Amino acid sequence: MEQQHGILVLNKPKGLSSAQCVARVKRLGQKKIGHAGTLDPMATGVLLVLLGNATKLSGYLLEGGVKTYGGTLRLGVTTDTWDAEGSIVSETALSEDDLARGSALEQAARREVEAWLDVTEQPVPPYSAAKHQGQPLYKLARAGKEVPVKVKSIHVSHASVQWVNMPDVRFRVTCSSGSYIRSLAHSLGIRLGCGATLTELTREYSHPFGLDVAHTLDEILAEPERLPEWIMPISAALPGWKNISVGKVQEAHLKNGMPVPHLPEFGTFESGERALILAQDGSPLALAEARMDRERPVWAVLRGLFTH
C-alpha cells in the first residue's frame, strides 16, 4: 500500500505499548509513521497515529490539547509503578466499616477525586519515560538506582466519580496533555493514608478526536485496504487553525521556505495567529504563523507539509 498522509485514530488495545501498535500499522506499507501522546501498555483508548506529512504535527497536537480519561483505582494497594503493572509495595487491610457502602473512606475518596480540580502540580512516576540527565527514569528505577523526584505542572478541568464498589473507585478526568493519571491515583492514596493504585485506564478523548471515530487494531489489520477511508485529514486535527488557500506563486514561495505576504482574501490577520496553508487542490502545504516582517504582514512557515 502506498504511503498515506493524515491521522489514524486508533483504539489501542490493552497489553501493547504505543510503539508496538505503531509498528503493526507500519507493516501496512506506512514507512513514515509516528504517534502523538503515549499510552501505557495497560491503558486502552484513543491513540493518534500520524502518517506521512502528519508526522510533523506531533508537537502542535500536544500543544494545549486536552485529554479525557475513564479509569479505576483501587484503595489499599500501592505499587512501584503506581499502576497494576507494577509490583506491590504495600497493602493496607481495609475494615468491614471501610468497605461498607457509604463509608467514611468512600466519602473521603469521592472528595479527593473531586479535589483533583485544584491540582496544579504532580510528581512524575519513577517508572516513566521522563528523563534525568538524559536517562529515562524507568531505566534508573529498573537498575535499582535512586530516582530523583520530578514535578510537572498540569491542569485538571473536570474530575468526577462514576461509581464506587469498595475498594474500587471509578472516575472520569479531563486534563492537560502530559498529565499522569497514575500519579493522581497514587497521590490520592497517600492523602487518604491507605494507598491506592491505578488498575484500569481508557483514554476517551485526545483533542480533537474521541473514541467515536477510533478503529481497533484488529479491524485495521483485518481490512488494510480500508485504511485510506479511515484516515482523518490534517485539517481535522487542527480545528482552531485558520485554513488559507494559496495560488501557484505563493505555493512556490512556501516550498522555498519563504513567507507568504498576507492578502485580503485570506481574511483577518492577527500577529501570532496560526494557519494551515493549502494548495489550490486542497492538499496541505505548510503550518504557518502570522508575523510582521518590516511592518509587512506575512505568514511565516513553521513546518512544511508538502510531499513533493
Name each model-derived stretch.
Residues 1-183, 187-213, 287:
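RNA pseudouridine synthases
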